UniProtKB/Swiss-Prot annotation:
ATP binds at residues 258-260, 274, 345-348. It comes from Cenarchaeum symbiosum (strain A). PROSITE patterns: AA_TRNA_LIGASE_II (PS50862). This is Serine--tRNA ligase. GO terms for molecular function: ATP binding; serine-tRNA ligase activity. Its main location: cytoplasm. The gene is serS. Catalyzes the attachment of serine to tRNA(Ser). Is also able to aminoacylate tRNA(Sec) with serine, to form the misacylated tRNA L-seryl-tRNA(Sec), which will be further converted into selenocysteinyl-tRNA(Sec). Disulfide bonds: none annotated. It catalyses: tRNA(Ser) + L-serine + ATP = L-seryl-tRNA(Ser) + AMP + diphosphate + H(+); tRNA(Sec) + L-serine + ATP = L-seryl-tRNA(Sec) + AMP + diphosphate + H(+).
Length: 418
């Protein structure tokens, strides 16, 4: 949710943001609702004071033996007008909130403007391990080796599900264990969140229309399967005042469940885009003045992780038309998929400023005598394991079908190759 002060004082900037994001939004209706709710709020306050004064006057008249007929009528008239003003205020407030909860976040000045991914900017590349000259696709190789079964998973659960088998299970668990050790050694608190989340918590972390077709709802219950631990961690401190101690750096580990409703025809083979996967997510609650440093820090840590694995990647700054609505700035890390001869997105690293914290009411203060402020929230993937498994299989395969295990994972897998 945007700071109301920004809406009132910088409507041109807000309009420019909507245009840059290609979002169809009735800004005039939001501003009108805001003006009406504030007008009727003030009117109701004034009438409340007048009614209270009239009530005291009636009481005084009774004590003095003065006729109270006119004063009582005036008090009743004021009560009726107050009731009408409060109704108008509530109506305008509802209209305002309905719109305010759907407007996207402001965009940082450093974000390139453009309609879609064609305006994204590649910032740098890291070469990593030499890739095979004639690689097999990860599904072909893993299925052929008996490490992956897509056919039986489709029979049991439908498309975009899979069975991991044998050493690929150990490699998946190795990615989880290494990720947690990696972040834990860098000051992150490990968190295993609930895998189900209420709608109000979900709406605090993400705009409703962006998750309705993405995540699974539990029928006849106010619960959703999480699409990422980010949402559960964002809501963890909802309706709280954090007393000092910022930043809070969390490393969330969880399965993730996604409908992938908009992915028809994309990545139909393999495990790059699936309905269920494990993910380790970074989430930070920061002071406003520190959030951009925290954003850079998260990206640096994530790059260090991929360099340690030896996976080739590039860092991409997303354009205004390609980034998520809650983010003010997003970097993607795209890893090289040797068999696809292409870079594919595996990491999204975003600064959401105070957009989520206003929705979730997460504030902080350093001293008890200070006013509270909204925290800034940041998030970044560290490892979505199904995508990393695909990257490792395609980039670390030998001609005989052997898959080399990246050095940091060998102690968890117990071997150098599978």
């Amino acid at each position: 949710m945007l700071d109301p002060h920004i809406l009132r004082s910088r409507p041109k900037d807000v309009s420019d943001m909507l245009q840059a994001r290609n979002v169809d939004f009735d800004l005039d209706a939001l501003l009108d609702a805001d003006e009406r709710r504030r007008y009727f709020m003030q009117l109701a306050d004034d009438m409340r004071q007048e009614r209270n004064f009239a009530g005291r006057q009636v009481a005084q008249f009774k004590r003095d033996g003065v006729d109270t007929t006119a004063a009582i009528k005036e008090m009743k008239d004021l009560s009726e007008k107050l009731y009408q003003a409060e109704g108008e205020q509530q109506s305008a407030e509802s209209e305002y909130l309905e719109l305010a909860w759907t407007i996207p976040n402001m965009i940082d000045k450093s974000v390139p403007r453009g309609p879609d991914e064609t305006a994204n900017v590649v910032l740098r590349k890291w070469v990593g391990t030499p890739t095979p000259s004639v690689p097999k696709g990860h599904e072909e190789l893993a299925v052929g080796r008996g490490l992956l079964d897509m056919k039986r998973a489709a029979k049991v659960s439908g498309a975009r599900f899979y069975y991991l088998k044998g050493s690929l299970v150990r490699l998946n668990q190795a990615l989880i264990s290494h990720s947690l050790d990696f972040l834990g050694s860098r000051g992150y608190t490990l968190v295993q969140p609930p895998y189900l989340i209420r709608r109000n918590a979900m709406e605090g972390a993400i705009i409703a229309e962006d998750f309705e077709d993405v995540i699974y709802k539990i029928e006849d219950d106010d619960l959703y399967l999480i699409g990422t631990s980010e949402h559960a961690m964002a809501a963890m401190h909802s309706d709280e005042i954090i007393e000092g101690g910022l930043p809070l750096r969390y490393a969330g580990v969880s399965p993730c469940f996604r409908k992938e409703a908009g992915a028809h025809g994309k990545d139909q083979k393999g495990i790059f885009r699936v309905h269920q996967f494990d993910k380790i997510e970074q989430f930070v609650f920061s002071k406003p003045e520190d959030s951009w440093r925290e954003h850079d820090r998260m990206l640096e840590i994530t790059e260090e992780f991929y360099q340690g694995l030896g996976i080739p990647y590039r860092v991409v700054l997303l354009s205004s038309g390609d980034m998520g609505k809650v983010s003010a700035k997003t970097y993607d890390i795209e890893c090289w998929m040797a068999a696809q001869d292409a870079y594919r997105e595996v990491v999204s690293c975003s600064n959401c400023l105070d957009f989520q914290s206003r929705r979730l009411k997460v504030r902080f203060r350093d001293r008890t005598d200070e006013d509270t402020q909204y925290v800034h929230t940041l998030n970044s993937t560290l490892a979505a394991t199904s995508r990393l498994l695909a990257c490792i299989i395609e980039n670390f395969q030998e001609a005989d079908g052997t898959i080399r295990v990246p050095q940091p994972l060998q102690k968890y897998v117990g071997k150098e190759a599978i």
